Amino acid sequence: MKLSYLDQTGHLTPDKLEQTITKYAPLLEKMKGQQGLDPMGTGWMKIDRWAGEEELSRLEEIAREIRETSDAFVVIGVGGSNNAARSMVKALQKPGTPEIVWAGNTLSAPATSRMLASLSGKDFSVDCIAKNFETLEPGAAFRLLRRALRERYGDGYSKRVIATGTIGSPLETLCREQGYTFLPFPTDIGGRYTALSSVGLLPAAVAGLDIRRVVEGAKKAREAVYSLPPRENPALQYAAMRNLLYGEGYRVEMLASFEPALQWFSKWWVQLFAESEGKEGKGLFPAAAGYSEELHAVGQFVQEGSPILFETFLSVEETDTPLPLTPDGVEDGFGYLDGKDFGALNDAAFQATRTAHSARLPVLTLEIPRLEEESFGEMFTFFQYACVLSSGMLGVNPFDQPGVEAYKGWMFKALGKNAT
């Protein structure tokens, strides 16, 4: 990934950035050696451990069976259990593959009823993804979907159930008792870091993606992190820019893109940084915007509102989708577009927005060559390493999320469960 920036505010200057990179360069070496990091959160750094040949072959075989027997594949999960998979599937799903249905990510009865109704008349399989099988949304949805499967397929329904959980968890016990297929949820990886494991890769494989190419992209990004020196290391540079701007008083980072296919990746990114850094009264608030549409919504605030945010653009260099605008004989006032490609319009809007916004706030740009499987593997891995570095600069643990337990205690009490 290429990283660049524009800034006319004076908050992000070459000298300030150089000082910040120099200050935190030792963090890069510590991270590569996993020094000071919770070993129960670093499993994703060993890509082959959870995405090696044996694991990939098994996932490909299971995905093949699902494609042959199912019109729809229901992924039950919330947060880290579905965000990575959904970002890949929404952007790159291949024609002729099963519909991927997302469940267990809401407690809305109307939304859940619509999800169940959408499966009517379809052959379907499910994958319940839950690290400890205590989260309410997937647990409740799994109960409803088990009933739907049993009503449709009788006692043989268990052949259509996959459960992804930790070894020794209640979910594994349930699989053993009911005859479901069990896939391991990595014990040494938190949910938001599980893209390169069965959690993220099985739904992607069912959707027709080449998951080996996803892994190749991840390895490419990892190699860059481990081989490039601090001043050429994009992950350290990006983390340093974020830390520098946080120190300059900025409190919001907005990830923006002119490619709608990246909107679900943005949700993954938001969770990654919100849960990893938002603790001990610290951290940038991660927000996301989909341009050009939202230039007609939040663009006004970005240009002239409270100076609390900076922007990070995620840019796709090549779209490989020619769409020429040819005259149609109607005088519509848009003759200046004659002969231009639709992609050129999008690029012009991006360049203009970046220039205009940089007069008001710092603007970072991360470029990927094209939107494909390798790109997702590279983006997941790049941002995960950058997040660990950025969290280290803040002095917080990037692998826990103690704050989410507060609302759960009240919720479980209201529902009659003994919360600890």
Residues of each region from the PLM?
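Extended, charge-enriched "interface" segments that sit outside catalytic cores
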Residues: 1-64, 328-336
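A short, well-structured juxtamembrane/interface segment
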Residues: 50-67, 232-244
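Glycine-rich phosphate-binding loops that contact phosphosugars or nucleotide phosphates
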Residues: 64-228, 409
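Flexible loop/turn segments at secondary-structure boundaries
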Residues: 81-84, 109-111, 134-137, 169-172, ...
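Short helix-loop-beta junction
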Residues: 88-99, 148-151, 272-283, 356-360
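Active-site phosphate/pyrophosphate-binding segments
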Residues: 152-311, 400-420
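Helicase-primase coupling helices
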Residues: 287-371
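C-terminal helical/tail subdomains of lipid-metabolizing enzymes
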Residues: 370-420
